[in-house]
Amino acid sequence: MSFKLFDKWDVTEVTVEDMGLQNYVCLDEIVVPHTMGRHVKRQFAKSKVSIVERLMNKIMRTERNSGKKNKAYSIVEDALEIINNKTKQNPVQVLVKAVENTAPREETTRIKYGGIGYQIAVDIAPQRRVDLSLGFITKGAMQSAFKNKKSAAQCLADEILLASDEDSRSFAVQKKEEKERVARSAH
């Protein structure tokens, strides 16, 4: 028996093309993306949580939506519906493409040597790449929804669509490029 996400979209046909992210973008078949926080106590267990639920959890991190899982659930469901209506594609595939396009590969870290701090470029772990990507997408969507007539779901759908096309108008793509540019300058 095959389950569809929100009883609408089949996740078995979704593919992750970025080889580094394949083990960290979970596409398990579930109807309701809500694990009740079972993954919290184990170190890398969040990579086994559905990518859609992780997007919901990132939406809940903003001040206005803190802890409001039902609100985040409806925002994500509506956003996926909008994406499906606009593109006629599986919206989970569009989300995965957006995550791949906005996941930075390099960032800087501070090294202190001899009392002097240096910025050096380091590769980012795949788990952190997915986290940063989802964070960029949700932050961009929530910022554009603030004091705007558009709903949060519409703004999230727009951000995901722009990010999946690697459009430079996307907040997430801009943040990724900024992070990688800073890392390149630290070489």
From Swiss-Prot:
Gene3D superfamilies: Ribosomal protein S7 domain. Keywords: Ribonucleoprotein, Ribosomal protein, RNA-binding, rRNA-binding. One of its GO terms (molecular function) is rRNA binding. GO terms for biological process: translation. The keyword Zinc does not apply. It holds the Pfam family Ribosomal_S7. The keyword Ribosomal protein applies. It comes from the Archaea. Part of the 30S ribosomal subunit. Belongs to the universal ribosomal protein uS7 family. One of the primary rRNA binding proteins, it binds directly to 16S rRNA where it nucleates assembly of the head domain of the 30S subunit. Is located at the subunit interface close to the decoding center. This is Small ribosomal subunit protein uS7.
